[in-house]
Design a protein with these regions (language model features):
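Pyridoxal 5′-phosphate
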Residues: 1-205
Length: 205
């Protein structure tokens, strides 16, 4: 069977690399983390965590929905990354992205077969299943074409604006917002977080 371990960070919504490393061991097969916490706005150190996990032979899966489209999200040391389009990518619901490291694709067996992900000349029945050699192997049937069109338009907009420009603008707004909230007596979650871990999400009361 599979044993699931839940990471309980010392501070809510703030996961430090050392806490991840302390939880995994020689039996750990995969670690799954969000690139940014949806309440605290804390961005994890993806490269630091991913590099160490890889050195230990542990797969790294990232939920990137809170950073893709808002901040650069490195995947050099990530095996899988998924993100829906409807948040920071500004795209429609039911559209999204899935990144699978090239070296991992041969290890993953598609669970659904269809006319898109199989090599099947002339649609003649075959004795064996021969999957497409690239990411098409995971796209079995007709795609969400309208969603893809909308998603493509949103990506064109983001590329035109520039991801670094978007990230810089979000952090500039945060630098103005957080002191203003503190001055009014608000309690701001992780107000003192380094900008390398900050995002466009600010929670306060």
């Amino acid at each position: 069977g599979v044993e699931l371990k839940r990471l309980e960070p010392s501070e809510p919504g703030r996961i430090e690399p050392e806490e991840v490393f302390a939880l995994v061991d020689s039996r750990t097969r995969m670690a799954a983390l969000a690139s940014c916490h949806y309440v605290s706005g804390y961005r994890i150190e993806i490269d630091t965590i991913g590099r160490e996990l890889r050195s230990r032979g542990i797969l790294f899966c990232v939920d990137g929905i809170q950073t893709i489209g808002a901040f650069p999200t490195p995947v050099e040391h990530v095996d899988f990354l998924a993100a829906d389009a409807h948040k920071w990518m500004l795209g429609p619901c039911a559209s999204g992205v899935l990144y699978v490291k090239h070296e991992m694709q041969a290890r993953l067996k598609p669970v659904v077969q269809g006319w898109h992900n199989l090599n099947c000349p002339d649609f003649i029945a075959r004795e064996t299943l021969d999957y497409k050699p690239d990411s098409r192997r995971y796209e079995a049937g007709t795609a969400n074409l309208l969603g893809i069109v909308g998603h493509r338009a949103s990506l064109q907009l983001l590329n035109a604006l520039g991801l670094d420009n978007i990230a810089t603008d979000l952090l500039a707004k945060r630098r103005r917002l957080v002191p203003g909230l503190l001055a009014k007596g608000c309690d701001v979650m992780h107000a003192d977080v380094p900008e390398a871990n900050a995002s466009g999400i600010v929670t306060f009361h």
